[in-house]
């Protein structure tokens, strides 16, 4: 079958990073700047539409390429979901999902980086991605300060050259790697169907959580200013690390030393709070650290992302899953909402907590010691399965620890496998 290689460059008033590819593609402001394409090993060509106040016109009265519109074979693109959704929602050309082959997925399945630039270095191919692209996107794909898009023939010529180079680079890189197996490709298409269906989320709950988080932020920063006599007014301040470092004991300082630098990151904060030694961590310092932990809680950010990514019409978050996103293992990963990484903690009475939150009632101390504790327990209840259905999350236990010794096929490897066969805890055995 003839392979169609292609790449789109687009512009939109929607921020792709914050709103996600589905909301981006479906927005009425999203337009195609150019489409570069090639069939098999043929020359790369480019189609450029022209926009008027009445809508999209074809440049020089040239219609959309008929050979592309009628293509029934495989369509190769890097991060192919983007091209597929632009076809569906912007150009309204309904190619079958099964026609699409994602070269970024192919790269990850080969334990290579997913970005076109990085995988080019990995594959050591001569055809490279053009570094100018990011600048051109900022200039042409994003509205200016006055809200209008830049119209510049010279920059557009550069954009076309950049788009064509991406097609050449993608084609050469893909050919340099092992292709996806039939099973991998089928699994990729299943992943995309799941992404198209989306996950229903509780938007009113997410917005309520954001209000509680904002109110707590004000209280936290007031408390931090009080505890530090005004030296620190925000736990996000770089001064906080130095303030803590000056007031903790020698053992605590050792815990703060990470790769020859002092840190106050999540792991360090957890270790310091676990000491529970007033000689090492004075009570006021411990409270400031706890305030920082509350403020930086990932649950707050997840609720914000949930509200941003949810479709305005049906409250579904789409495009959340990345097939073979864990490049080292091939396991699934997640974009945006990071649904694969929700805390296991769940509120004991989620319905009661939700009712209290959406009504604006006090949730502390009735449902937890701190607001962040309550919010953390409401992340999973914010995902809503269809009636009569359940969300199931499963993962292989210690997959790398099992596969690597099996691949080694050595006495030492067999000894490690025997630990798993005996159902022992490898961490305890190694300790």
Language model features: what each stretch is:
Residues 1-14, 34, 135-375, 384-390, ...:
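Conserved "right-hand" nucleotidyltransferase catalytic core of DNA-directed polymerases
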Residues 13-17, 46-48, 402-405:
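Cytochrome P450 core scaffold surrounding the K-helix E-X-X-R motif
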Residues 16-34, 407-412:
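A short alpha/beta connector and helix-capping loop motif
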Residues 22-23, 400-431:
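Metal-dependent catalytic core segments for phosphate chemistry
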Residues 27, 94-98, 371-375, 382-385, ...:
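Short, surface-exposed loop/turn microsegments at beta-strand edges and helix-strand junctions
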Residues 30-33, 37, 41-62, 69-178, ...:
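Active-site-proximal helix-loop-helix substrate-binding element of RNase H-like nuclease domains
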Residues 81-93, 110, 242-248, 397-412:
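Short active-site loop/helix that positions an aromatic residue
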Residues 94-97, 218, 251-258, 352, ...:
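Cytochrome P450 catalytic domain signature, combining two hallmark sequence patches
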């Amino acid at each position: 079958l003839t392979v169609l290689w292609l790449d789109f460059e687009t512009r939109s008033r929607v921020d792709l990073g914050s709103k996600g590819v589905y909301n981006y593609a479906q927005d009425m402001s999203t337009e195609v700047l150019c489409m570069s394409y090639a069939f098999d090993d043929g020359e790369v060509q480019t189609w450029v539409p022209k926009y008027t106040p009445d809508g999209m016109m074809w440049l020089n009265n040239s219609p959309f390429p008929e050979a592309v519109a009628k293509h029934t074979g495989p369509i190769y693109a890097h991060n192919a979901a983007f091209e597929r959704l632009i076809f569906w929602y912007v150009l309204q050309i309904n190619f079958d999902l099964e026609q699409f082959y994602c070269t970024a997925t192919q790269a990850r399945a080969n334990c290579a980086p997913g970005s076109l630039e990085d995988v080019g270095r990995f594959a050591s191919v001569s055809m490279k991605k053009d570094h100018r692209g990011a600048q051109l996107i900022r200039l042409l794909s994003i509205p200016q300060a006055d809200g209008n898009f830049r119209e510049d023939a010279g920059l557009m010529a550069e954009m076309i050259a950049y788009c064509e180079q991406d097609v050449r680079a993608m084609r050469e890189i893909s050919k340099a790697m092992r292709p996806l197996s039939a099973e991998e490709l089928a699994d990729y298409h299943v992943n995309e169907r799941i992404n198209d269906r989306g996950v229903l989320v509780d938007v009113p709950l997410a917005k309520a959580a954001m209000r509680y988080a904002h109110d707590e932020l004000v209280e936290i920063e007031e408390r931090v200013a009080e505890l530090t006599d005004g030296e620190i007014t925000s736990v996000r301040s770089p001064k906080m690390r130095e303030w803590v470092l000056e007031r903790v004991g020698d053992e605590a300082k050792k815990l703060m030393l990470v790769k020859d630098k002092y840190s106050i990151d999540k792991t360090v904060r957890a270790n310091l709070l676990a000491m529970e030694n007033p000689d090492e961590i004075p009570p006021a310092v411990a409270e400031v650290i706890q305030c920082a932990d509350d403020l930086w809680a990932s649950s707050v950010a997840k609720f914000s992302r949930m509200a941003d990514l949810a479709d305005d019409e049906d409250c579904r978050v789409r495009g959340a899953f990345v097939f073979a996103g864990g490049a080292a293992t091939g396991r699934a990963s997640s974009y945006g909402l990071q649904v694969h990484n929700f805390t296991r903690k769940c509120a004991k009475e989620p319905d009661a907590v939700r009712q209290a939150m959406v009504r604006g009632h006090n949730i502390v101390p009735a449902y937890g010691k701190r607001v962040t504790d309550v919010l953390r327990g409401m992340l999973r209840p914010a995902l809503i399965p269809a009636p009569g259905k359940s969300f199931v999350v499963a993962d292989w236990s210690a997959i790398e620890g099992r596969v690597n010794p099996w691949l080694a096929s050595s006495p030492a490897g067999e000894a490690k496998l025997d630990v798993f066969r005996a159902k022992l805890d490898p961490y305890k055995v190694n300790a």
